[in-house]
Design a protein with these regions (language model features):
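Short S/T/G/P-rich N-terminal loop/turn motif that feeds into the first structured element of a domain
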Residues: 1-68, 79-96
Length: 96
């Protein structure tokens, strides 16, 4: 079952994009992330959401245990403050 992790925090879209690009450069093929999307709340400027997609919950947990992910998480906390996580099992996807 596919799994999505939503990260919600305050910062700039540019900083969030740079953070993901740095993670991609460092993690390379080690990461289990399949897709990452950065979104900015139109109604609350500076409020960001990152939608991180995995093939499964198990892959997400493996990814969370990687040293590169732990380091990136520490850097994100120092850059963006508290990050709120939502952990979602994908039940169905509809392509329109």
């Amino acid at each position: 079952m596919k799994f999505i992790q939503i990260m919600e925090f305050t910062g700039s879209a540019e900083e969030a994009i740079n953070s993901i690009n740095n993670y991609i450069d460092i993690a390379g093929e080690e990461t289990k992330v399949k897709k990452a999307t950065v979104c900015e709340d139109r109604d609350t400027p500076g409020r960001l959401l990152q939608v991180i997609e995995f093939d499964s919950y198990e892959d997400a947990m493996i990814n969370n245990d990687l040293e590169v992910t732990k380091k990136a998480s520490e850097e994100d906390t120092s850059s963006f403050g508290d990050v709120e996580f939502k952990n979602l099992n994908v039940v169905e996807v509809f392509e329109m």
